[in-house]
Amino acid sequence: TGTPEQAVNGNVTSLLPDAQQVGWIAGALAGLMTESGTIAFIGGMELDTTLGKYEGFKEAAAYVGEQAGKTVEALDIVYSGDFSATDKGIEFAKAMMDQGADVFFGDASAVDSGARQAIDEANAASGSVKIFDIAQPSDLLGQNECIICSQVTDNASLVGLCMEAVQSG
């Protein structure tokens, strides 16, 4: 086993969605939806893809917010250290809501589910949905009231584009 750069034949490569673009899409929506001007991002671990999503998220939110006449700032990213601790998601979301965050995005799997639980509880306590989450592909069913969209990458299309590039030289 090894990595693509260690491959001895030139026919091996890897495909990876552009994490910063994924973050940009989420950030653009966050910039439009935030009322408080404060947004939040929860990461599982400090990975390049997670950092890319966070950078795109905060950059796009600030840009789109400015275009809409408001200032949008992202709280510092927090990391749970894993991808399964829903209790950390609850803890992080509560702390970030206490700092005014009203739109969340994450890259932390089950930790994100915990965050959505805390967001839904805060919304229920206030009597209306005013705090939102931009979810991941596993959340397509919209099982939480706070979900305003779900980020989905289409790996079949990625492979198709790659094959077209190979065919065209």
Report residues per predicted region.
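A residue-level marker of the well-folded mature domains of exported/periplasmic proteins
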Residues: 1-169
